[in-house]
């Protein structure tokens, strides 16, 4: 076997391989012997068919199969010998085959980039320092009460957190526009669902009033014909409701799994959940900064085959989220996923190099801790832990999570990490 390797473009490679004629003939004869042992031909007992008849009847197809097998096996031998690491599936380009002559073919593929990590010491990471305070717990209890609130109609004027039912008609330069009209529209105030100025124009009015408000569409508004335009909305305020918060009764508290129904028990449970969310948020915040710094410091070529593969993964995930099938997934435009796919491949290659250079392996104690942390959010943590322990795929996924964390920590060990005090709400709002 003769082998030559050339670079086509960037990460592209072409391996040209020549297989000696006698190697082909030896392999063909060997396979024909195997065929002769199995075939049945009228007039002959199984295994007793003369080789010339076997060759005459099956020679062409056997030779084709043998060539395909030799091409594959010789390519694998070649890349092992040349220490080449292909990325993605190779493309075989067969040359012209003539009986009794050497056979030359080529294989085209991409290789993984040679990554030499740099700039780790210049990466800057700001680690949030946060404590869950009693005031934070009070705020979360208010949120829980609001989520369980009922609405009661009122006669007084609209206030910041009320709910209103309105009819409205919007116009620009006295002309109504598409999507600017609705009847019995229910709007919870204070959630920022409408354009700036819309809610402010409703505050202070009472049910039964009809009025007009003036607003301006933002320059970044999605409808091109409305960007930056001044508009008027004719409003018919049909109903105003105020939120009635439930009291922290034992019955209410037990809805959240606090068996004794005490306020102290609920506060303890809420604090525990907040601290778990906080730990995850800090970890994610630090991780995202470390990875962003790693990517900026290391500009690497990315094999197109890996991007294509990642796009397929993202397509299928998107289709599953919206109830589509595999055929619909493949019809989604690749442009929707290309940037994200490339980013994921780059991050994977860089973290892979961090893992390789630091000779990292998944820490089983960390894996155990991650599973326990995740399970603590469920009603029966022991059941979840046991389920994971019996599922190899889930365990392998968690080992990958642990290994990624260890790689990020290796980056942080060399990066410039500073600490900054912040509040629970500030950090969680940044995550959102």
Swiss-Prot record:
One GO molecular-function entry: ribosome binding
Cystine pairings recorded for this chain: none
Main location: cytoplasm
Keyword Cytoplasm: yes
GO biological process: 'de novo' cotranslational protein folding; cell division; chaperone-mediated protein folding; protein transport; protein unfolding
Catalytic activity annotation: [protein]-peptidylproline (omega=180) = [protein]-peptidylproline (omega=0)
EC number(s) stated in the UniProt entry for this protein: 5.2.1.8
PROSITE patterns: FKBP_PPIASE (PS50059)
Keywords assigned: Cell cycle, Cell division, Chaperone, Cytoplasm, Isomerase, Rotamase
Domain PPIase FKBP-type: 161-246
SUPFAM superfamilies documented for this protein: FKBP-like (SSF54534), Triger factor/SurA peptide-binding domain-like (SSF109998), Trigger factor ribosome-binding domain (SSF102735)
Keyword Cell division carried by entry: yes
A Pfam family: FKBP_C
GO cellular component, one term: cytoplasm
InterPro entries: PPIase_dom_sf, PPIase_FKBP_dom, Trig_fac, Trigger_fac_C, Trigger_fac_C_sf, Trigger_fac_ribosome-bd_bac, Trigger_fac_ribosome-bd_sf, Trigger_fact/SurA_dom_sf
Role noted for this protein: Involved in protein export. Acts as a chaperone by maintaining the newly synthesized protein in an open conformation. Functions as a peptidyl-prolyl cis-trans isomerase.
Protein family: Belongs to the FKBP-type PPIase family. Tig subfamily.
Quaternary structure annotation from Swiss-Prot or TrEMBL: Homodimer and monomer. In vivo most of the ribosomes are in complex with monomeric TF. Uncomplexed TF, however, is in a monomer-dimer equilibrium with approximately two thirds of TF existing in a dimeric state.
Domain comment as written in the entry: Consists of 3 domains; the N-terminus binds the ribosome, the middle domain has PPIase activity, while the C-terminus has intrinsic chaperone activity on its own.
Name by which UniProt lists this protein: Trigger factor
Organism listed in the record: Shigella boydii serotype 4 (strain Sb227)
Source species taxonomy: Bacteria, Pseudomonadati, Pseudomonadota, Gammaproteobacteria, Enterobacterales
Name of the gene encoding the protein in the UniProt record: tig
């Amino acid at each position: 076997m003769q082998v030559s390797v050339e670079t086509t473009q960037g990460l592209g490679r072409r391996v040209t391989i020549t297989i000696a004629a006698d190697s082909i003939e030896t392999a063909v004869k060997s396979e024909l012997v195997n065929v002769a042992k199995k075939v049945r031909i009228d007039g002959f007992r199984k295994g007793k068919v003369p080789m010339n008849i076997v060759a005459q009847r099956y020679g062409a197809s056997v030779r084709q199969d043998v060539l395909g097998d030799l091409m594959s096996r010789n390519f694998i031998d070649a890349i092992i010998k040349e220490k080449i690491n292909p990325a993605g599936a190779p493309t075989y380009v067969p040359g012209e085959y003539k009986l009794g002559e050497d056979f030359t073919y080529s294989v085209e593929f991409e290789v993984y980039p040679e990554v030499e990590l740099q700039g780790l010491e210049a990466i800057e990471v700001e680690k949030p320092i946060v404590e869950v305070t009693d005031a934070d717990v009070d705020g979360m209890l208010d949120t829980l009460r609001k989520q369980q609130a009922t609405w009661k109609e009122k006669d007084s004027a609209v206030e910041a957190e009320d709910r209103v039912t309105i009819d409205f008609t919007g116009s620009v330069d006295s002309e109504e526009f598409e999507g600017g009209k609705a009847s019995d529209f229910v709007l919870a105030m204070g959630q920022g669902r409408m354009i700036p100025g819309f809610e402010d124009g409703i505050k202070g009015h009472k049910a039964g009033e009809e009025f007009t408000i003036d607003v301006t569409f933002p320059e970044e508004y999605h409808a091109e014909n409305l960007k930056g335009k001044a508009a008027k909305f004719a409003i018919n305020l049909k109903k105003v409701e105020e939120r009635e918060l439930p009291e922290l009764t034992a019955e209410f508290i037990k809805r959240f799994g606090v068996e004794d129904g005490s306020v102290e028990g609920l506060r303890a449970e809420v604090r525990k959940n907040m601290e778990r969310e906080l730990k995850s948020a800090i970890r994610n915040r630090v991780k995202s900064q470390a990875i962003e710094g790693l990517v900026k410091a290391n500009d690497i070529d990315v094999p197109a085959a890996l991007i294509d593969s990642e796009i397929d993964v993202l397509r299928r995930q998107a289709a599953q989220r919206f109830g589509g099938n595999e055929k619909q997934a493949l019809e989604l435009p690749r442009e929707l996923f290309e940037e994200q796919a490339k980013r994921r491949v780059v991050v994977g290659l860089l973290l892979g190099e961090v893992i390789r250079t630091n000779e990292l392996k998944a820490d089983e104690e960390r894996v155990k801790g991650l599973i326990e942390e995740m399970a603590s959010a469920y009603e029966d943590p022991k059941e979840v832990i046991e389920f994971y322990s019996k599922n190899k795929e889930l365990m392998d996924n968690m080992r990958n999570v642990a290994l990624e964390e260890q790689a990020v920590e290796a980056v942080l060990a060399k990066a410039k990490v500073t600490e900054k005090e912040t509040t629970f709400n500030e950090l969680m709002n940044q995550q959102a």
